[in-house]
Amino acid sequence: MEELEKTRKILKTSFFIAVVTVAVLFAFPYDLKPKEWEIYAGSYFITTLGLTVGGATIGILLGMMLAFFKFQKTKNEVVNMIKDIIIDEYVDIMRGTPMVLQLLILSVVIVIFNNYWIAVIALGLNSAAYVEETVRSGIESIDKGQMEAARATGMPYRMAMNEIIMPQAVKNILPALVNEFITLFKETSVVGYISVMDVTMNSKSLQAAYYSVKPILFTGIIYYISVKLFSFIGKRLEMRLKEND
């Protein structure tokens, strides 16, 4: 069984290398000038990756806060009901409307930031809705008896959540969080609608300048390799967490 798994990994890696090699040979934009390569690299590393990291940071922090507030109950039932309705509606609005539409609305509403930071905020607010649902399901997957036992020993609710429930929930939801990061990475391709020059928008400009589809095809390869890398890192983190159990 172990030998079969090793063979599968070798074949999978070989296939990936073969696909990328053939794709690069046919799609590599050899005609690009050094300055154009510099701009292209900046549109990927600074814009696309920058938007992804910024949006993911906002999304994870805000999403976890929303999930935490959803579970934290007060003695006032009316306050609890209003709080839950607000969080639920926020999640429904963000999940029920297109990312492009949210981006366009924020670009009109928020005028104190440039479009790059508006894109970061829009991506983060959208991601937070999905992270909240993911974290909520992760917390609900933990046996309720653990919280009850912690509370019975006199541990405050917040401490019990931070030290007992959340560490276990994070292990359960890590694959879903990695998938959300990958989804966010691909969703950055819509920021061109508010004139942010990400790698997709840049490749479209190069395609128009050179009358060639190669810049767009090459960008597709870049996305493919990036997603493979993110997935690999996510799996390694998951394995590391399991080893520490």
What label would you give each PLM region?
Residues 1-245:
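Transmembrane alpha-helices and adjacent helix-loop boundaries
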